[in-house]
Amino acid sequence: MAPLRALLSYLLPLHCALCAAAGSRTPELHLSGKLSDYGVTVPCSTDFRGRFLSHVVSGPAAASAGSMVVDTPPTLPRHSSHLRVARSPLHPGGTLWPGRVGRHSLYFNVTVFGKELHLRLRPNRRLVVPGSSVEWQEDFRELFRQPLRQECVYTGGVTGMPGAAVAISNCDGLAGLIRTDSTDFFIEPLERGQQEKEASGRTHVVYRREAVQQEWAEPDGDLHNEAFGLGDLPNLLGLVGDQLGDTERKRRHAKPGSYSIEVLLVVDDSVVRFHGKEHVQNYVLTLMNIVDEIYHDESLGVHINIALVRLIMVGYRQSLSLIERGNPSRSLEQVCRWAHSQQRQDPSHAEHHDHVVFLTRQDFGPSGYAPVTGMCHPLRSCALNHEDGFSSAFVIAHETGHVLGMEHDGQGNGCADETSLGSVMAPLVQAAFHRFHWSRCSKLELSRYLPSYDCLLDDPFDPAWPQPPELPGINYSMDEQCRFDFGSGYQTCLAFRTFEPCKQLWCSHPDNPYFCKTKKGPPLDGTECAPGKWCFKGHCIWKSPEQTYGQDGGWSSWTKFGSCSRSCGGGVRSRSRSCNNPSPAYGGRLCLGPMFEYQVCNSEECPGTYEDFRAQQCAKRNSYYVHQNAKHSWVPYEPDDDAQKCELICQSADTGDVVFMNQVVHDGTRCSYRDPYSVCARGECVPVGCDKEVGSMKADDKCGVCGGDNSHCRTVKGTLGKASKQAGALKLVQIPAGARHIQIEALEKSPHRIVVKNQVTGSFILNPKGKEATSRTFTAMGLEWEDAVEDAKESLKTSGPLPEAIAILALPPTEGGPRSSLAYKYVIHEDLLPLIGSNNVLLEEMDTYEWALKSWAPCSKACGGGIQFTKYGCRRRRDHHMVQRHLCDHKKRPKPIRRRCNQHPCSQPVWVTEEWGACSRSCGKLGVQTRGIQCLLPLSNGTHKVMPAKACAGDRPEARRPCLRVPCPAQWRLGAWSQCSATCGEGIQQRQVVCRTNANSLGHCEGDRPDTVQVCSLPACGGNHQNSTVRADVWELGTPEGQWVPQSEPLHPINKISSTEPCTGDRSVFCQMEVLDRYCSIPGYHRLCCVSCIKKASGPNPGPDPGPTSLPPFSTPGSPLPGPQDPADAAEPPGKPTGSEDHQHGRATQLPGALDTSSPGTQHPFAPETPIPGASWSISPTTPGGLPWGWTQTPTPVPEDKGQPGEDLRHPGTSLPAASPVT
């Protein structure tokens, strides 16, 4: 057994196997496997006082999915990926748990790391909006939809912890956040879907936030405005800007000072598969319940509700298409675009959302990604979040904070000091801190932007809401618990037998049955431990349906008082009772009240000289207690800590060392030298009054009369001065026994030392050898003395009373030393007055008291006329010192005086507006400006007090308005010049010129349109060749709107043809087109079309030459190749660009782009169906839809040895070089 015990002493940590596939029969354990520390607990349901009711903690919502509306497209094929519709099983046994019907609050006891917490919960009725739904989608189509319910979401607090907060759901066990006064905890059931076995207890896992070993949002994991790359969205933003500026949502308005973020929650397939289809809805509701509680934290400074209006579960293929792994920017862009398409267009629709939260387990990069100040914007109010357990709630809160306008703490602001304390907006949102809070910078930034978010002013809730649910019951077996704790295959250990199977759960694997493991925790309450028995609170008890739970303990009767601890000098005796009538059982409470009761006994003084009882206990150790290899003379020492008053602590009179004797003082020992009556008993201080009654509050007056009024007290004081005539101490004065409040002090600097001697015993208690005095506190004669030395003058004080008379002596340094002078004073009862010497002055202490006006009570009203009364106190007439009121005669107390106060009229809170801020845009349709608005109450001192919005009368002034919504000015944009059209001599170059706005749309530009064509000069051509020049003309191209605008294109460079070459006929089918006759003045074109040009020069051409290469012209009505507007066009000098009037006046030219095919009536017959910028366009007489000029980047080369341009006889045509596109 020894080796076995050795092996068992090294226990393996908890290993949790997560079942990621939905519908698997393997138990799902919702432990991440990343916990550095955790605890196991079995919560129970209690009443409002914390008394045990049941181990059933789950509500019925998990067992019933409610009514479901299936809306499946009729053509959608049904396959294995379709979701099952959950049935609504009957409650087990058909009965309801007592006390659950109609309950509005729930109470649970949860043990968290050894500390039992009593949770007080109420339904969170403002998390799910009435009329909201949950949808299941696949391939961007809705499979089915059902109402979204929140019947088991609760918030609340912890009894006895004012700053605690709880956000928990009990759909399937207790799951959520418990925030205590020191740290934050998460709780969740060890295994899901086990409600039917819960009746006798269910194990839950509790872990601190800092136990989650992971990092959340990275510093660069948040998308700011300038980095929000949604591709080419300017036009789309312009469209939604119209809706944003012109559409006003008509919704129910929230209460002033309250805001609601209506959230569309989207969960992709990776989250659904991880948590399971049956559990994911309850899980995400719990997650958002925690987010809602985070935004309710008082450090935020404003009340913000998280309201779910819609839940969408996204299918597998759709999830993959929305999230691009490793690319957060692209993923967020796609999610925001898709979420915008899901928006309900009707602003009054119950599912119209303000903000989108997307949850995924796919690795898109950081833990969160969101645009800053995107709230209420149709495209930018969205956040992408990586889901990784309940800690993801803080990622969601962090990213939503960015969308609300909050920046990272410490980045550009002065809140870096709060990041280590757990601020929600820390750059690294880690779980390494105990309690979350919103930093002062987050609070300030939110207050700056919040007034401009009009969409958050809606109140989406109706007053009526469903009642909280019923609670069913569930349980587990020991083998199942072993599998939960250590993995598949583990079962109850049978290697050894134990008489207490419910003390600890031992498990082993069949592969090694003699190697047993345990978590050192008991099996769950209700686990079967023997036939007919189950485990409960670590004990194996009989099962019984009438089993009594939560049996509180009760006291037995008191025993008789025992013997007194001392025979004289004041002792104690005690009696006791037991908590066994009945004994606490089954989680019941212990008995309340003390177990022992004490009485003071034998309080008369002991005969003989006075002996300090505590000093006697220290002195007994003088003979045998060795400290540092030596024996000492021990005297009592009183510590400053009240908790150590009844411990025996002694001080060495030789060395001053203080030693704890590791035992308590004897019963009846005084607790403190400052308290003459309270005594120690069983190591605790028992308060005793001056009447010797335990627990009495009676006290002595100044001269020791119990409950007296100082009327019998006398003060004796005097001044003494004597010169020493011989060596030795000089006796100055004797103070009698019973004296109190003794003060002795030297009147001037003197080398004398004060010496105190006990007149009865003759022993010295202070400076017996005249050592140099030092300031110290010591005990003697059962009293505490304070010896102080300041500026060479010594003083001695004690509160008394003196048990025996003392003598005050002065010890000079040498014989015949200087005169010593002392002043002394003490208080004594008149019956104990000594004979008064000539140097003593007896003062009357018959202090009389009177009622005196102390102050005026606060005014009943701050303004508008109030009433206040006088407050009287008890005052001593002699020195007008205020004393306790019981010293004055209550019968003589005067009646209060009444007077009016605060007669000034009350000021009313008013709305105060700040100046309008700068416009967010200089032009366009999205310009808005905001201003701050506060409800302020003017105060009489000229300041103002911030009041809640509901305190101000009238409607809240406008905080946001449109501004500068004018069209943005357009500018000319120029392309690069093309290559020269000629290879030698003179040619032309062309560029594109377009009129565009900043949004990249067409606009109206001021001023003349820049030139699109210019002349280029190259070295002259050699030989007999003439310079080939080509001039550009204006052609028309189709725009996406179906209009035709001028477009200038240069001709293709033409190879040189010898002027001596005879004219044998036209060399291109285009020579027959009259529209090209204007180019006959160009030598190159003249050689190409010599026959047509000669005919044009000789007169009107009756028709085309029927040559073998001639083809009939194909000009048609509406052709994009119009001829010259007048004859002057043909006579224009070569090389000068020509164009239409529109072109000359700077009319905008549309770049080649997609054509609008939705209007066939405006489609040109030569316009291509799918034009591609940069591709070659060509014309064919046999192919309709071609354009006469091609766009190409490389002109077709022509062999130098042939004197004709390169043409394809099958598709005759001439190509033009393309100009560079405008950027």
Curated annotation (Swiss-Prot):
Output compositional bias ranges, type Pro residues. Answer: 1101-1125
| CDD domains reported in the protein's UniProt record | ZnMc_ADAMTS_like (cd04273)
Return the Basic and acidic residues bias intervals: 1199-1211
Q: What is the superkingdom listed in this entry's lineage?
A: Eukaryota
Q: Which cysteines are joined by disulfide bonds?
A: C336-C382, C376-C455, C415-C441, C482-C507, C493-C516, C502-C535, C529-C540, C564-C601, C568-C606, C579-C591, C980-C1016, C984-C1021, C995-C1005
Q: Which residues are glycosylated?
A: N109, N475, N941, N1027
PROSITE patterns reported for this sequence: ADAM_MEPRO, PLAC, TSP1
Q: Which residues form the propeptide?
A: 23-252
Q: Which InterPro entries match?
A: ADAM_Cys-rich, ADAMTS/ADAMTS-like, ADAMTS_ADAMTS-like, ADAMTS_CR_2, ADAMTS_CR_3, ADAMTS_spacer1, MetalloPept_cat_dom_sf, Peptidase_M12B
Q: What is its EC number?
A: 3.4.24.-
Please describe the post-translational modifications of this protein: The precursor is cleaved by a furin endopeptidase.
Task: Extract the ranges annotated as region (Spacer).
Answer: 730-846
- The Disintegrin domain covers 461-551
Q: Which GO terms describe its cellular component?
A: extracellular matrix; extracellular region
Domain text from the record? Answer: The spacer domain and the TSP type-1 domains are important for a tight interaction with the extracellular matrix.
Provide the protein name: A disintegrin and metalloproteinase with thrombospondin motifs 14
